[in-house]
Amino acid sequence: MKKTAIALVVAGLAAASVAQAAPQENTFYAGVKAGQGSFHDGINNNGAIKKGLSSSNYGYRRNTFTYGVFGGYQILNQDNFGLAAELGYDDFGRAKLREAGKPKAKHTNHGAYLSLKGSYEVLDGLDVYGKAGVALVRSDYKFYEDANGTRDHKKGRHTARASGLFAVGAEYAVLPELAVRLEYQWLTRVGKYRPQDKPNTAINYNPWIGCINAGISYRFGQGEAPVVAAPEMVSKTFSLNSDVTFAFGKANLKPQAQATLDSVYGEISQVKSRKVAVAGYTNRIGSDAFNVKLSQERADSVANYFVAKGVAADAISATGYGEANPVTGATCDQVKGRKALIACLAPDRRVEIAVNGTK
């Protein structure tokens, strides 16, 4: 049975197209399943029954056919992880006791269960999952007369008892709306028979039931996933006149520079995932070494101000370029006198702030 079920599922997977493994979040699904179950352990816990089975006249049929329906709600499906709540109703099958080839007793079980199902996508369209929950199981006990095999209604009983339910399995999305699954499920300590003549005495017979099932489910609301628009990129550049921001030849911010920098910070703060680059420049007056040092110190002063306002230190850089990239070009080449030259070269003394990020 197991090999056949696995072969059918694998064959289906080979012919299937790739789809999302778990259902989309906040959607429902419903399905059916069937397979083979087996009763375990409980029969060996009853000394009288165990002794009887040692005789060749007795036989215990533990294997059974199982089937059920289920429905679920997909709570989460993010980063390959999924979480769903699943409700189902199963016929968990029946065990039969025979004596001399005739039916002696039957133990039948069916009921509803509620479980949480956690899943992980291991391949495109393929999930492995585990379930844990509780099942309310009705167990019916039927007995038959020794002589003619007719049912003995006086001994018959039924109980309703909660049992732990656990399962592991794999699920494959053949289509976004259609999935197949193969799982192994087990119930713990099912039923507890009490004879009619001694209702306060429980026979020590409460097996657990394991079953392997193949199922198919339909997923509602599995249209194409909404396309998330890529964030719009934003690039902004600000140029600050150093004569307004700094004293000539100095790297300390002037008091009046605060208003200008606060205005720039207001623009920066509107950019998400931002990266800020501060570049300092000087004019050509003075040595190259001094100009590079001064431009670096000015860039650092501006960057430190923005960090103090709230820009992450690892999201901002400061670089001094000295007299590189002058904006005046050859405009001031014919200017005579130091004061006049300083005034003409004022546009070269600047701090540029480049901001890149998203809206």
Curated annotation (Swiss-Prot):
<feature type="transmembrane region" description="Beta stranded">
    <location>
        <begin position="27"/>
        <end position="37"/>
    </location>
</feature>
<dbReference type="InterPro" id="IPR000498">
    <property type="entry name" value="OmpA-like_TM_dom"/>
</dbReference>
<keyword id="KW-1015">Disulfide bond</keyword>
<dbReference type="InterPro" id="IPR011250">
    <property type="entry name" value="OMP/PagP_b-brl"/>
</dbReference>
<feature type="disulfide bond">
    <location>
        <begin position="332"/>
        <end position="344"/>
    </location>
</feature>
<dbReference type="InterPro" id="IPR050330">
    <property type="entry name" value="Bact_OuterMem_StrucFunc"/>
</dbReference>
<feature type="transmembrane region" description="Beta stranded">
    <location>
        <begin position="83"/>
        <end position="91"/>
    </location>
</feature>
<dbReference type="Pfam" id="PF00691">
    <property type="entry name" value="OmpA"/>
</dbReference>
<feature type="site" description="Part of salt bridge gating mechanism">
    <location>
        <position position="86"/>
    </location>
</feature>
<dbReference type="InterPro" id="IPR036737">
    <property type="entry name" value="OmpA-like_sf"/>
</dbReference>
<comment type="similarity">
    <text>Belongs to the outer membrane OOP (TC 1.B.6) superfamily. OmpA family.</text>
</comment>
<feature type="transmembrane region" description="Beta stranded">
    <location>
        <begin position="126"/>
        <end position="134"/>
    </location>
</feature>
<comment type="function">
    <text>With TolR probably plays a role in maintaining the position of the peptidoglycan cell wall in the periplasm. Acts as a porin with low permeability that allows slow penetration of small solutes; an internal gate slows down solute passage.</text>
</comment>
<dbReference type="GO" id="GO:0009289">
    <property type="term" value="C:pilus"/>
</dbReference>
<dbReference type="GO" id="GO:0007155">
    <property type="term" value="P:cell adhesion"/>
</dbReference>
<feature type="transmembrane region" description="Beta stranded">
    <location>
        <begin position="164"/>
        <end position="173"/>
    </location>
</feature>
<keyword id="KW-0626">Porin</keyword>
<dbReference type="Pfam" id="PF01389">
    <property type="entry name" value="OmpA_membrane"/>
</dbReference>
<feature type="signal peptide">
    <location>
        <begin position="1"/>
        <end position="21"/>
    </location>
</feature>
<keyword id="KW-0813">Transport</keyword>
<dbReference type="InterPro" id="IPR006690">
    <property type="entry name" value="OMPA-like_CS"/>
</dbReference>
<feature type="transmembrane region" description="Beta stranded">
    <location>
        <begin position="64"/>
        <end position="75"/>
    </location>
</feature>
<comment type="subunit">
    <text>Monomer and homodimer.</text>
</comment>
<keyword id="KW-0812">Transmembrane</keyword>
<keyword id="KW-0130">Cell adhesion</keyword>
<keyword id="KW-0998">Cell outer membrane</keyword>
<keyword id="KW-0406">Ion transport</keyword>
<feature type="transmembrane region" description="Beta stranded">
    <location>
        <begin position="178"/>
        <end position="185"/>
    </location>
</feature>
<dbReference type="GO" id="GO:0015288">
    <property type="term" value="F:porin activity"/>
</dbReference>
<feature type="transmembrane region" description="Beta stranded">
    <location>
        <begin position="211"/>
        <end position="219"/>
    </location>
</feature>
<dbReference type="InterPro" id="IPR006665">
    <property type="entry name" value="OmpA-like"/>
</dbReference>
<feature type="transmembrane region" description="Beta stranded">
    <location>
        <begin position="110"/>
        <end position="121"/>
    </location>
</feature>
<dbReference type="InterPro" id="IPR002368">
    <property type="entry name" value="OmpA"/>
</dbReference>
<keyword id="KW-0732">Signal</keyword>
<keyword id="KW-0281">Fimbrium</keyword>
<feature type="domain" description="OmpA-like">
    <location>
        <begin position="233"/>
        <end position="359"/>
    </location>
</feature>
<dbReference type="InterPro" id="IPR006664">
    <property type="entry name" value="OMP_bac"/>
</dbReference>
<keyword id="KW-1134">Transmembrane beta strand</keyword>
<protein>
    <recommendedName>
        <fullName>Outer membrane protein P5</fullName>
    </recommendedName>
</protein>
<keyword id="KW-0472">Membrane</keyword>
<feature type="site" description="Part of salt bridge gating mechanism">
    <location>
        <position position="181"/>
    </location>
</feature>
<dbReference type="GO" id="GO:0046930">
    <property type="term" value="C:pore complex"/>
</dbReference>
